Curated annotation (Swiss-Prot):
Subunit composition and interactions: Homodimer.
Protein name (database record): Bifunctional protein FolD
Keyword Ribosomal protein: no
Annotated source species: Cenarchaeum symbiosum (strain A)
Function noted in UniProt: Catalyzes the oxidation of 5,10-methylenetetrahydrofolate to 5,10-methenyltetrahydrofolate and then the hydrolysis of 5,10-methenyltetrahydrofolate to 10-formyltetrahydrofolate.
Length: 282
């Protein structure tokens, strides 16, 4: 499954949505907030700005020093919430010690929550009525649809229970009438569970503790590998890619699978947020 190709198709649709919004007087704008000087976080933010430029989304780049307090950050978020020219707010994680992530995320306006992580948007997702959905889960669903993977009545196993991936995916798959099982670090004998799955989504990210091997996958299953592990071999996912590819009908590579979809969905969510704000201004 080629995440780059699917992401390119999504970006073309986003370009059209941006052009339509601009023709109606709305210039979609994403504001990013980076606290501290973590090099990896800086790279991620630059990549997001570059992706926005590709599709015509305007950006604001807010950089705060490592001595920034939680109060300073909350004040900036309040300003961005009230700024009518800003449609999406993204606070790059992780945050420095002493700043509570839940406090920061909860401060973002749900209408501008392009990460889909505010308590309100998380609750709407459980009810099946969310408009802004976490980018990685949304990208996974987009990729499955692109490849015409039928989900209704299928058995899905998630090997992750985080609020970024596993929990949102659980609700998204339930909404598509799949039967969903969630595995995690305390699950005993994950292979006995994953072997019955039609779709496996794995996002552990620690090859020393977990590798998805062919004996854990049934013939013809779809394998979505969200994980990224760095080693002297380069970037790898959870799956033993070459071996599992022999059994899977579809599998995502690492890199080049889910990663590009996450960025593409950020762009999509930004245009969705701009449309929401525009509709409320009528």
């Amino acid at each position: 499954m080629d995440g780059k190709a699917v992401a390119a198709a999504v970006k073309e649709r986003v370009k059209m949505a941006v052009a339509e919004l601009k023709s109606g007087g709305t210039d979609p704008c994403l504001a990013t907030v980076l606290v501290g000087d973590d090099p990896a976080s800086g790279t991620y933010v630059r990549n997001k700005h570059a992706a926005c430029a590709e599709v015509g989304i305007t950006t604001q780049d807010h950089r705060l020093g490592p001595s920034t307090t939680e109060g300073d950050l909350l004040k900036l978020i309040a300003e961005l919430n009230s700024d009518r020219s800003v449609h999406g707010i993204l606070v790059q994680m992780p945050l420095p010690e002493g700043i509570r992530e839940i406090k920061v995320v909860s401060a973002i306006s749900p209408l501008k929550d392009v990460d889909g992580l505010t308590p309100l948007n998380a609750g709407l997702l459980t009810a099946g009525t969310a408009t802004l959905i976490p980018c990685t889960p949304l990208g996974i669903m987009e990729m499955l649809d692109y490849y015409n993977i039928e989900l209704e009545g299928k058995e899905v196993v998630l090997i992750n229970r985080s609020r970024l991936v596993g929990i949102p995916l659980h609700h998204l798959f339930l909404g598509r009438n799949a039967t969903v099982t969630t595995c995690h670090s305390r699950t005993k004998d994950i292979g006995s569970i994953s072997r019955r799955a039609d779709v496996i989504v794995t996002a552990v990210g620690n090859r020393d503790k977990f590798v998805l091997t062919p004996d854990m996958v049934k013939e013809g299953a779809v394998v979505i590998d969200v994980a990224i592990s760095r080693s002297d071999r380069g970037l790898t996912g959870d799956a033993d890619y070459a071996a599992v590819s022999e059994k899977a009908s579809h599998i995502t590579p690492v890199p080049g699978g889910v990663g590009p979809m996450t960025v593409a969905m950020l762009l999509k969510n930004t245009t969705t947020a701009a449309s929401l704000v525009k509709s409320l201004e009528r």
